[in-house]
Structures are given as C-alpha cells and as structure tokens.
Amino acid sequence: MEKLLHWSIANAQGDDEAKARAGQPDPKLLEQLFGGGPDEPTLMKHAMAVISNPEATLENKLVAFDNFEMLIENLDNANNIENMKLWEPLITVLDDPEPELRAFALSVTGTAVQNNDQSQNNFAKYDGALAKVIKLASGRAEDAQVRTKAFYTLSNLIRHNKLIYDQFNQLNGLQIIAPVLKDANASEKLKLRAMALLSTVLTVADMNADFFALLRAYNIIETTLEFLHPECNLYLIDRVLNFFSQLINVGFEFSATELEKLKVGVKNIEPVEAQLNEDDYKTVQYVSK
C-alpha cells in the first residue's frame, strides 16, 4: 500500500525519476482499490465452488464460508442465493461429516433468511430442508455449536412467516424445545436459543386452545415452570417470564397444578426481582396470586 502511495504521488506530479523509483503497483491491488475485480455474485459463486470442492482443505472451506456469509448479509445478495441456484449446494453441507461446516451452513442460512421472507420461502421450498434443520437442532449427540446454530436458523426461518411455521408444526417442531430445556448437559446458550425459538413461535402461531394443548402435550409449560428459580440463569428466567406473560395476555389459563407451581416459582424468584423485566414479572405475579 505504501508503494502504491509513492507511485500515485509521483504519477500525479509527473516525476519520471520518482515513478521509476516507486516501480509499478500490484495490478491486483489496483483492481481491489478501483473496483476492477469480480462482482459480488461472482464472488459468491467462487466461494460456493470452494465449499463444494471435495479436494479443498477444511481451512479453505471455512474461509470461503466466512466470505460467503459477509456477502449475503446484503439483502440483494441473500436473495441471489436462489437466483444463482446456490441453495441446493448450501443445504447439502448440512449433511457434511465435518461439524464446523454444518455449523457454518446453518449460520449462513440463518443470516440469509433473517427478516427476509423471500429467502425464507426460497429455502423452505427445497424438499427436506426444514426437516434437516429440525433434526440438527434436536440431536442430543450432535455437536453443541451445530445445535445452537440450528435453533438460530429455525427462529429466523419462522419469524413473521406463518407458512413456514405451519410446515414446522407439521414436522412436530415444537417437540424439540422441552428436551433441550430439561437436558442437564445442554449449555445455557443452547437453552436460550430454544427459548428464543419459542418466543418466535408465539409471534406467528394461532393463540387458541389447540395451540395451548400442543404446549402441554410437548411438556413445554411444565418444563418452563422449572426455570422459576433464583439459581437459574437470569436471562433464562426473563425469557420464561416473557413467555408466560405473552400467554397470559392472549387468555391462556393455567391448570390448578400449573398454577400451584407458578405460585411457588414466583415466590422463589423474589430475591432477583429487581434484575428481571418488571412488566413481565408483574404480569405473571398477578396471575399467581
């Protein structure tokens, strides 16, 4: 870069001697600086070619994934995944034996579909794609980072998209939440991702008796009640209170057994009340009295 600066100054001044001393700049560097390199769709294709190449090293594939994810943070580039037929090779990586690649494929997918209904629908139309993400999220033997990224991706796929939530529901997606929350070996980060997915579901599901029955059938109400304890992660407690608050606001009624556990739970978390969301706490506290 310093050499390019000297050359630029000498060239502007018309100093032949100084230009000779500076030498010719690197053509590739000039391309990068003045926009003469490949356009972003081409870079996306190149990155996916590396990712899909069985001869490429893991390190090179991870670098290519990193570059690809930075590119698709742009909405137009995210939508170009479909236009350039790159969803299929990306979805194929979800079956790769290397967990780092599976995690990156999920991360890229989650980023591409975030607040982007066009890319959400593009992904979901591929046969078995949503089911693969659900399977990766639910697998207890799966790599922890892969599971965390899978929950992130599911949340971003479902958010503000009723059609994809309906597909998720048809695949019994809600049943993957309680096992994570009950798993003593699951990280708090994974449990927070599971609660984030649950919160996202509440924004698109029909809040009716059938949905409430599903929450009970999949042990979600019972399991979340167990987090109302001061020794639990405060962020998890907050997530649970928000979950209950949203249910209460749409007319959900706790059973007698659930209400008794709720009363005990609210009493248990009184010592940390000041560190919790005030509105959610008071809503749940009022019902528990």
UniProtKB/Swiss-Prot annotation:
Q: Where are the ARM repeats?
A: 13-56, 75-114, 118-159, 162-203, 209-249
Superkingdom, natural source: Eukaryota
InterPro entries tied to this protein: ARM-like, ARM-type_fold, Hsp70_NEF-Inhibitors, Nucleotide_exch_fac_Fes1
Q: What's the chief localization of this chain? A: cytoplasm
* Compartment(s): Cytoplasm
Instruction: Give the family from UniProt.
Output: Belongs to the FES1 family.
Query: Can you name this protein?
Result: Hsp70 nucleotide exchange factor FES1
Q: Which organism is it from?
A: Kluyveromyces lactis (strain ATCC 8585 / CBS 2359 / DSM 70799 / NBRC 1267 / NRRL Y-1140 / WM37) (Yeast)
